[in-house]
Amino acid sequence: MVSNNILNTVSQGVFYLDPLTHGVIGLAISTFSGTPVGMTNPITLGCSIGAMAPDIDVVTKFIWDDSVYLKHHRGFSHTMPALLGLSGVITGILHLLFPESAIMGIFLWTMIGALSHTLFDILNSYGARLIPFVKKKFKMNLLMLYDPVVTLLALVLIFKSQKDIVVYGTSVAIFIVYLFARYMMRKRARKAIEENFAHGYKIISIDVLPALMAFHKWNFVLSTNSHNIAGQVNILNKRIETRKKLRREDKDLVKVFKGSNAGQYFTNLSPNYHVTMKSDEGRIILEGIDLRYFMRDNFMHHATVVIDENLNIVESFLQPYKYEKRIPVAEHF
């Protein structure tokens, strides 16, 4: 049941389990304050709400559309100034509700919760901005979007009635060991990919990222001198599944795609993209494909730029989450 719900929400572009997981992590972190978990505890509320607050950028999806949401998601709202501001607002509201509470204590734990959100986003494959005025999203490609081990560890901290320094120390140690284990799993996956494609291809780069749902599988995007290859590797048996092997198109056509407004948006969104070309009634259709996320026999995000025989842009549109979805993009003709 969980896997079907996750597949549905991911394909629709709203990963509801993501903020829920952040909230659970925030609750777990609040236990380190030594205070009981409860709805009447401002530290509990502050830490858990703070852990979900950076995803306030989801409002862009409902005010505008998916393309604006994708552009801003895990952006400025995840940077240090935004985390401080959000923590301040949450602290102010909680202090009004609990005037007898220590305001600095609430702010500290709310800020820790908010910071945990950005740090856990950095640990997975989407990444997040941490520094304002730096558009690059930092990512470590270690954790799945919904990570069962992290969630289980958080739930133990929340529901275990008796907690002491041994429990807290053990929890932190398990988390650190788990991160190292995920790092070694990714390293094993990369080695398997290199061994499989070393013969017959000149490898330029390999990006390895956690599968959306499978704990023992890792997705990869392999760039070679002739092809871009997207697939998945099972680290238990080192079995490689090649999902798509796409031949690189003419560099001039790729340049036209990247020079369009739709292409600029798309290449900023995805560090791992491929451009395909096909002709249709005197027009050339350039299609950008985000090679990172593959669901239901297709990639999640696309962008299309249509040009004439003189390489002038006729139209362009973005296709986030669903190939059939088309969001027109204004171009300078």
Q: Which sequence ranges carry the predicted segments?
A:
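N-terminal membrane-targeting hydrophobic helices
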Residues: 2-202, 206-210, 217-224
